[in-house]
Amino acid sequence: MKFIDSDLQDYIGTNFSVSKNNQGITEMTFLNGTSLFNKTNYAKIMLGQCTDCDYLYKGFFEGFIYDKVLIAGLGFGLIPQTLSEVNNCSKIDVVEIDQEVIDYNISSGHLNSDIVIIKSDIFEYTTNEKYDLIIIDTIWDESEMTDEDYGLLESRLLPNINTGGALYVPI
């Protein structure tokens, strides 16, 4: 799924900007030059539901049932919105470090009310909640996460995964 581009506000901020590109697709561009696009395949790829994608992106979670999900990284909120509207998950928590990204999404009003946004760094976040699936959507390139970083995330988050659940770090 994707959002209706006209429903997403243009924005120029301190850490990122949001605008429509030449094709009318909304784009969130961060200071480091990384861009997110409001496209249907983004959440499908991240959730292994892309039927017309390269084989690397198909069926990640085939046969895996999840209902309670924690996502690190908000962006436009395509993943949590898909989990809410398409997958009908009962619990969707999102940890986002950037208050500006949180404020943009709240003021834009395009996310469902069942999505809980938590201001925190995923490397410092603690909770007693248990999840079926934890998705780390904060990394754009494998060089951005060291083995030490992964080990830290794994040791912090594995206690929060239900039996049979998964930690998904797509790098």
For each feature predicted by the language model, list its residue ranges.
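Class I S-adenosylmethionine
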Residues: M1-Y66
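The AdoMet/dcAdoMet-binding core of the Class I SAM-like
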Residues: K2-Y11, T51-I171
